[in-house]
């Protein structure tokens, strides 16, 4: 992340969101890396009356790390590149929250993002989160898409709108259950390297470590450091908020209950949690300070990217829309129970990454999530006599005890139609588990059918698809064929590559030369003797996905920074006009206060701004594929 173009992009994002003062301090820290207060003051050329309040605000926004040394007592400051980059995803995160939890939840999260971190008691006093503001925004209507029992449990149906905490606290717990907010810990204000050094120092000072020596000491220190580091930085608030693998307050798009079930349920979701927490001091301390958590966001983006990949294959490789919807339900279940895409900070190199499977999801749980109105049978082949519902042509039995037990033993739901539908869902997932998709994996856990995905395989597939899409757009389908051959076979000389790809030598050489100039393929020279004569040298072409991903990532950072710079330039050209349109009396009344040419100029500016910001968002999706998954 700490490259020239990444630092430039983060500086632009900070200045775009927080102003020139924050941008100047952040640029100084990113340029000189780690500074104490006197040096920061000298390099930034700012007085104390501006520097100190700005530093405090940037620490509040998690844009700057601070660490006080145990040796000399000097406090050092360091730029937080990761939090600065995630400013570009704030709108996408709020869109996710509004889609899943409603408009009021998005407002609460937006307030926490604006404050950096905040106490719950302070959030209760904010006017934009009061019941009057909620009524004005129409939140009860927004949450009308929930099931009735979820509306009752979340308290978002307007029944308790006279007391604002009754609406705020369930919303905070819903955000915590989804992983959007976390508990503030002191170690989160320090860099990862400083936290490791502090944890290692604390582990080595323990009395039991003095009796160990050599390799055993180093292993014990590493194990203890990782455990202490996880304990200090863990801000998870999902304890007690995940029920049967689904967060409380999750928004459902359909009702899966049967007609004979009661239409209402007891209000036990958040009411029981609040009653149990009233006298629990530890739980109250947990919820005293909250902040925005970005760790789960790549998981959501990854799930959406995988669903988009399956949807694109509907016409290419015969994947039906129903199969894509079933896969979306599986990814949603996995996303609820997974906090991070991977355990390590860096993406392991290809060939060195081990298997990392997600949590297994029971087939019966997926049957509850899939929309009952979704047609699953029309896109699969007919069932034969060996399938669970094998009594085709016969009248179904009403009291089939043996058949019911047989279905339940295999993880299928009881009942005729339920068993058929569960089997159809299993068939759709089995289709995705077969080549060339390889997107799912079937397992038996305690005699029940479960489905899982392999994270590293899917992340690698997404990266390869993105690179192949880019190569095909730049160099054509012939280059794509050559790259696929090199990726499958490894290093090849020109003659062997021509035999496998079935291309003329002239076309092959042109494609290889153009891709080598673009950095997508490279040439390795293997001399046969010590003289290194060209006639006695073997030239091998190869394709390195890791190197290309890193190069594409840097180019993406550069393109994003250029888009933001262009946006700033276009804004400066019509600065006076934009200041006029942003006045409180003009905003919302443009037709009344602006002339016809000014309205045309405003429309052109909004279209240009949407184009540039949309391009930045699209490039951010590429960054997520190349860096975060």
Curated annotation (Swiss-Prot):
Segments of skewed composition (Basic and acidic residues): 257-268, 389-409
Residue ranges, compositional bias (Acidic residues): 272-293
InterPro entries: POLR3C_WHD, RNA_pol_III_RPC82-rel_HTH, RNA_pol_III_Rpc82_C, RPC3, WH-like_DNA-bd_sf, WH_DNA-bd_sf
Biased composition regions of type Polar residues, renumbered to the chain: 374-388
GO cellular component: RNA polymerase III complex
Segments for region (Leucine-zipper): 556-577
Biological processes per GO annotation: DNA-templated transcription
Subcellular location field: Nucleus
Protein keywords: DNA-directed RNA polymerase, Nucleus, Transcription, Zinc
Gene3D superfamilies: Winged helix-like DNA-binding domain superfamily/Winged helix DNA-binding domain
Region described as Disordered: 136-164, 247-294, 373-420
GO MF assignments: single-stranded DNA binding
Family membership: Belongs to the RNA polymerase beta chain family.
Subunit structure comment from the entry: Component of the RNA polymerase III (Pol III) complex consisting of 17 subunits.
Role: DNA-dependent RNA polymerase catalyzes the transcription of DNA into RNA using the four ribonucleoside triphosphates as substrates. Specific core component of RNA polymerase III which synthesizes small RNAs, such as 5S rRNA and tRNAs.
Name by which UniProt lists this protein: DNA-directed RNA polymerase III subunit rpc3
């Amino acid at each position: 992340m700490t490259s020239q173009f990444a630092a430039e992009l983060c500086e632009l994002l900070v200045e775009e969101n927080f102003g020139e003062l924050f941008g100047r301090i952040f640029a100084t820290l990113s340029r000189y890396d780690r500074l104490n207060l006197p040096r920061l003051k000298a390099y930034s050329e700012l007085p104390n009356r501006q520097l100190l309040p700005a530093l405090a605000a940037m620490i509040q926004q998690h844009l700057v790390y601070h660490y006080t040394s145990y040796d000399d007592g000097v406090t050092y400051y360091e730029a937080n590149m990761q939090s600065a980059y995630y400013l570009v995803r704030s709108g996408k995160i709020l869109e996710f929250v509004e889609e899943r939890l409603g408009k009021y939840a998005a407002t609460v999260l937006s307030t926490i993002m604006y404050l950096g971190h905040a106490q719950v008691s302070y959030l209760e006093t904010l006017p934009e989160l009061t019941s009057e503001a909620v009524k004005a925004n129409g939140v009860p209507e927004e949450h009308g898409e929930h099931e009735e029992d979820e509306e009752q449990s979340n308290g978002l149906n307007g029944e308790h709108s006279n007391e604002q905490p009754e609406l705020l606290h369930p919303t905070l717990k819903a955000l915590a259950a989804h992983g959007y907010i976390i508990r503030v810990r002191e170690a989160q204000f320090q860099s990862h390297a400083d936290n490791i050094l502090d944890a290692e120092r604390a582990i080595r000072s323990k009395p039991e470590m003095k009796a160990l020596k050599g390799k055993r000491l180093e292993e014990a220190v590493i194990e203890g450091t990782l455990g202490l580091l996880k304990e200090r930085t863990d801000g998870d608030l999902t304890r007690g908020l995940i029920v049967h693998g689904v967060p409380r307050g999750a928004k459902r798009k359909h009702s899966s209950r049967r007609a004979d079930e009661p239409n209402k349920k007891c209000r036990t979701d958040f009411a029981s949690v609040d009653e149990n927490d009233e006298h629990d001091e530890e739980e109250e301390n947990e919820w005293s300070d909250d902040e925005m958590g970005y760790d789960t966001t790549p998981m959501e983006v990854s799930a959406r990217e995988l669903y988009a990949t399956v949807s694109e294959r509907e016409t290419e490789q015969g994947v039906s829309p129903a199969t894509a919807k079933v896969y979306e339900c599986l990814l949603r279940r996995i996303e609820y129970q997974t906090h991070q895409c991977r355990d390590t900070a860096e993406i392991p190199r290809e060939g060195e990454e081990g298997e990392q499977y997600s949590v297994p999801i029971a087939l019966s749980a997926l049957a509850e999530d899939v929309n009952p109105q979704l047609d699953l049978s029309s896109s699969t082949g007919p069932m034969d006599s060996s399938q669970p519902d094998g009594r085709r042509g016969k009248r179904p039995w009403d009291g089939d005890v043996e058949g019911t037990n047989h279905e339940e033993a295999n993880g299928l739901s009881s009942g005729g139609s339920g068993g058929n539908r569960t089997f159809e869902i299993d068939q759709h997932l089995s289709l995705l588990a077969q080549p060339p998709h390889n997107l799912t994996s079937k397992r038996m856990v305690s005699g029940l059918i479960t489905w899982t995905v392999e994270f590293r395989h899917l992340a690698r597939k997404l990266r390869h698809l993105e690179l192949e899409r880019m190569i095909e757009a730049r160099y054509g389908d012939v280059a794509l064929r050559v790259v696929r051959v090199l990726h499958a076979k490894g290093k090849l000389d020109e003659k062997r590559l021509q035999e496998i790809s079935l291309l003329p030598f002239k076309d092959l050489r042109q494609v290889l030369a153009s891709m080598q100039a673009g950095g997508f393929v490279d040439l390795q020279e293997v001399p046969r003797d010590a003289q290194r004569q060209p006639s006695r040298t073997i030239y091998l072409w190869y394709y390195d996905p890791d190197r290309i991903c890193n190069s594409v990532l840097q180019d993406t950072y550069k393109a994003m920074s250029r888009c933001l710079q262009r946006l700033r330039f276009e804004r400066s050209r019509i600065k006076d006009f934009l200041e006029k349109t942003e006045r409180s009396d003009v905003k919302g009344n443009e037709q009344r206060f602006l002339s016809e040419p000014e309205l045309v100029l405003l429309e052109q500016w909004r279209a240009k701004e949407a184009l540039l910001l949309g391009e930045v968002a699209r490039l951010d999706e590429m960054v997520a594929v190349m860096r975060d998954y």
